[in-house]
UniProtKB/Swiss-Prot annotation:
The chain crosses the membrane at residues 42-62, 70-90, 103-123, 131-151, 178-198. It is found in: Cell inner membrane. Pfam families: Rnf-Nqr (PF02508). Belongs to the NqrDE/RnfAE family. HAMAP family: NqrD. This is Na(+)-translocating NADH-quinone reductase subunit D. It is a multi-pass membrane protein. The lineage of its organism: Bacteria, Pseudomonadati, Pseudomonadota, Gammaproteobacteria, Enterobacterales.
Length: 209
C-alpha cells in the first residue's frame, strides 16, 4: 500500500524544497533552449513530466528483475521508448510546437532529471511512489521553465502565448521589446535570479563551506 506521507513528500518536495533546476542544477540546457515562449515551456514541462513519471513507474515495476550490470541500459531503453511516443504524439497533434522544440524533445532521453530519478529513486522504491516522484520532479522542472518562459516572452516580445500583452512601438504602442531576452544567455541570468530568490527565502538550501 502506498505511503501517503512519502507520496506527499516526493510530489511537493521538488517544487521548492528540492527543485531539480534551482537546487540540484539539473536540466539547465533545455531550460535555456525552450523558454523563449511560454507555450513551448509548457509543452516541454508536460513532456518531461510524463516521461519521468512513466519511466520511473515501469522501472520500479521490474527493478527486482534487472541485472545490476545492465540496469542503465534498461533504463535508457524504457526512457527512449517513452520519448519516441511523446515525440510522435507531438508531431501528430501539435506539429508547429514540435518543430519549435526541435531536437530537444529527443534529448529528454539524456535529461539528468529523468535518468537521475530512475537510478536514485525508482530502482529502490515501489511503483506508485516512483510515479508520483516523477510527477513531482517534472512539475518542479516545469515551474522554473514556465517562470523563465513568462519573463522572456513578455519582455522579449511583449506577448504571452503569442498574444500581444504590451503594445509595441512598431504597432503604435508604448513598449519597446528587449530582444536580448530572446537569446539563451538571458535565461542564465533569470535562472540565477530565481535561485538567489529561492535561497533567500530558504537559507537552509545554501551550501555550507
Amino acid at each position: 500500500m502506498a505511503d501517503s506521507k512519502e507520496i506527499k513528500r516526493v510530489l511537493l518536495g521538488p517544487l521548492f524544497d528540492n527543485n531539480p533546476i534551482a537546487l540540484q542544477i539539473l536540466g539547465v540546457c533545455s531550460a535555456l533552449a525552450v523558454t523563449t515562449k511560454l507555450e513551448t515551456a509548457l509543452v516541454m514541462t508536460l513532456a518531461v513530466t510524463l516521461v519521468t513519471a512513466f519511466s520511473s513507474f515501469f522501472i520500479s515495476l521490474i527493478r527486482n528483475h534487472i541485472p545490476n550490470s545492465v540496469r542503465i541500459i534498461v533504463q535508457m531503453v524504457i526512457i527512449a521508448s517513452l520519448v519516441i511516443v511523446v515525440d510522435q504524439i507531438l508531431r501528430a497533434y501539435a506539429y508547429e510546437i514540435s518543430k519549435q522544440l526541435s531536437v530537444f524533445v529527443g534529448l529528454i532521453i539524456t535529461n539528468c532529471i529523468v535518468m537521475g530519478r530512475a537510478e536514485a529513486y525508482a530502482m529502490k522504491s515501489p511503483p506508485i511512489e516512483s510515479f508520483m516522484d516523477g510527477i513531482g520532479n517534472g512539475l518542479g522542472y516545469g515551474v522554473v521553465l514556465v517562470l523563465v518562459g513568462f519573463v522572456r516572452e513578455l519582455i522579449g516580445s511583449g506577448k504571452l502565448f503569442g498574444v500581444t500583452v504590451l503594445e509595441t512601438v512598431q504597432n503604435g504602442g508604448w513598449y519597446q521589446p528587449n530582444g536580448l531576452f530572446l537569446l539563451a544567455p538571458s535565461a542564465f541570468f533569470i535562472i540565477g535570479l530565481l535561485i538567489w530568490g529561492l535561497r533567500t527565502l530558504k537559507p537552509a538550501q545554501i551550501e555550507k563551506e
